Amino acid sequence: MISLYQILAEKKKKKKNDLNIFAFSVFAIICFKFYSVNAIKLPQQEVDALQQIATTLGSKFWKFDAENCKIEMVGLTETPPPTAKQEIECECSPTNDTDCHVVKFAFKDHNLPGTLPQIVKLPYLREIDLAYNYINGTLPREWASSNLTFISLLVNRLSGEIPKEFGNSSLTYLDLESNAFSGTIPQELGNLVHLKKLLLSSNKLTGTLPASLARLQNMTDFRINDLQLSGTIPSYIQNWKQLERLEMIASGLTGPIPSVISVLSNLVNLRISDIRGPVQPFPSLKNVTGLTKIILKNCNISGQIPTYLSHLKELETLDLSFNKLVGGIPSFAQAENLRFIILAGNMLEGDAPDELLRDGITVDLSYNNLKWQSPESRACRPNMNLNLNLFQSTSTKKSSKFLPCIKDFKCPRYSSCLHVNCGGSDMYVKEKKTKELYEGDGNVEGGAAKYFLKPDANWGFSSTGDFMDDNNFQNTRFTMFVPASNQSDLYKSARIAPVSLTYFHACLENGNYTINLDFAEIRFTNDENYNRLGRRLFDIYIQEKLVAKDFNIMDEAKGAQTPIIKPLTAYVTNHFLTIRLSWAGKGTTRIPTRGVYGPIISAISIVSDSKPCERPKTGMSPGAYIAIGIGAPCLIIFILGFLWICGCLPRCGRQRKDPYEEELPSGTFTLRQIKFATDDFNPTNKIGEGGFGAVFKGVLADGRVVAVKQLSSKSRQGNREFLNEIGAISCLQHPNLVKLHGFCVERAQLLLAYEYMENNSLSSALFSPKHKQIPMDWPTRFKICCGIAKGLAFLHEESPLKFVHRDIKATNILLDKDLTPKISDFGLARLDEEEKTHISTKVAGTIGYMAPEYALWGYLTFKADVYSFGVLVLEIVAGITNSNFMGAGDSVCLLEFANECVESGHLMQVVDERLRPEVDRKEAEAVIKVALVCSSASPTDRPLMSEVVAMLEGLYPVPESTPGVSRNAGDIRFKAFKDLRRGMENNSKTQCSVKSYPSSSSTSSGAGQAVQERKKEESRP
């Protein structure tokens, strides 16, 4: 048998640099089941049947090893994703281990384009899994007479009726979700008395639920979402005593929810939403104590929220949004596992209990009649709960109804237009004869309960709901970006929401407006695979008036990845305009993956019909507008600082009587103020060493806590770094960049005051001795990686002034109280002037993080930061520094060790052993691969940071193959470490780097010793 490695070797002889070798085949060693180590023997009939199945399914190449019951290769038109699965399982007779038969085959996530095969020649077959393919045709009636117990055809193109003959089968599992089956649900399915799971969501099924389904007393999972059924929810569901999961979302059935639901004591996951019918009381769930998810959205439920819900200790998600609930809100004090509580769109009154407003819970109280709310209320305290939505949550008629936590809000002026780049950055767009500025909100992370008001602009958005079942709690998934796209930049980004997304403007001129909503479906594709099978439907409301029902972007635009503009009108009477997009449960939810649904929008244009939109009158380019608007203040600060240093301007505060009270120019402090804040630079306030200077904690006279960086003005380098940092930080504003509060130049002192980070640096949090470390689970580390990537993407691609940081490392990543990463120490930042392809510069940075082309030749591009980011991500994943880690054998640093782990297929060895029991293996391996691609030896092999962000968020494929380690001694990435190691061996030293930082793992001669050292450190009190 010729192995794949032999094939690869032959290929490499022909073409060494062919990186797309996997496009022609996939190698899969498949698990098999038999009871002897001897070669098994399948009947030739079954071997031939498998070959015929391959042809019918549309596989272009198939090689089946009958002696070992495994598939060696399945030829495909493209490399399947990591989730692809191909499996043949055989069983042999206990008395004759050569008498074997095929009992299962699975080809999942392969985009096979054929039809369903005949299986009559596989009489022992029990399981078929063909989920996530592109199979068309009908469901063969002959399958009903087989021995099948398990059928999964999730996400395909199958159509026609469900054969009634399946009522005579032995099925225990039937998943037909996300196809195009039509007709009614056969009443014969009621004969499947052993059936445990029946999943029929997202089809074209009509009619009522057959009464015969009452006999399915072994049912544990029943899902009928996104259908066109009729009739009421049947009371016979009380017979399903074993039921654990019930989903009826936009099924077409009407209410009320039967009261007998209370007898389903095994229910864990209850989802009933978007049902029509009369007003109904809250369904009785008092006896269903094991519930973890309760979704009763838009069910026309009235009355009060039952207090017993707050005693459900296992409850994680409670969504009662868009009903008619009144009264107060229970405390939910005993619901210890509660993570999401969505009560939007009701008529709730009174206060929100303090127990509800606790950290770690996402709370949405928007669109209610609460009376407690005021700027002084607990919910309005700064940073009290970052996941709290209070939009239109009070009954008051004042502006605070729309803009909570703002006292005596008054519009400074009224606008006649607004242009928003939803989920993107600020950009100018040519419209007719002008260029309009579309303000971006891409820097604002979303959330299951998010309220955002843009400072000084009087517009914002409210987002409601969580993407269920995606097993992802990162708020970055509420925006989308497609870096590789032929569309205009306006349609490469978008903002999405699971349930409801409302954009508003609070200060518009009254009158008639023309509204253009820009859409593009950037999550689905037009390719001939299952990615084009997705359906996204949502409703559009203007001023809370329904203007479009079941809006489908792909239908309107005649395909995916195609822009479409929806023109609408509005009349503004109270200076307030709302545009709400709402998901009503229709459309697919599992294409291309779980949790893909809900409204999505690329841009919004609002223009008055009677008053002109104010805009710049000159004909300058967008770059000129941005450079003047942002570059000029930076240049002024830069020049002032330079003149101060040269002594051309008076020093700050020399003749001031009371520098603490007098008002200073924005952004400046006196030396006395800084000394007062830091207790005269008391060593006890010293919190670390930044680039070229010490850092002190300080408290200003107004109570603001700052971090003060003290640089030496005696050094020309200190002066230059000071000016660089002032210019860089003052120009850049982003959630993942440190914020500058001000500076001071006085008495040979160069001082910067920037926002104080409660958790110091990432280096301190990860690599300090055990008692000083901050415990970080995998989701936290993943969040930090994403945040750093977004900050760098902003520096490189989104900021009007582009910067290369040049010194990305753990000590230059600061962490706020929520462990949000902030890139700091801009002292080495270089402006990418005139978008040059590279800059030849004097090398500055840190050994171990510097890209080889920069360290050796001073060749500087954005890709140098990408390299440093890759190394940093490996450190975050491993919990060990690159330079202080010395792997087993010839590995001289963490980067080389990680590359070796990829080659050996043991990627999880890179992961911090403290995380391995809990880590999401696929996610961790993907992150490591991203890090290795970023740290490729050649800059051309490294991605852009925007592509890195998309990879981490699952919106862009992670390369399966990464540039490997060069086995000759000249690999430029590791040469410095090898030379250093030889020098240390000659001098009997123990450190691994010229410049290193405190680490929890002392350097040793092998990977095992490094880990042992960390264990020793952690065992100390």
From Swiss-Prot:
The modification Phosphoserine is found at S840. The modification Phosphotyrosine is found at Y754, Y854. GO terms for cellular component: membrane. Residues 41-625 are extracellular. Its main location: membrane. Residues 1012-1021 have a biased composition (Basic and acidic residues). Residues 681-956 form the Protein kinase domain. The modification Phosphothreonine is found at T670, T841, T846. ATP binds at I687, G688, E689, G690, G691, F692, G693, A694, V695, K709. This is Probable LRR receptor-like serine/threonine-protein kinase RFK1. It comes from Arabidopsis thaliana (Mouse-ear cress). The gene is RKF1.
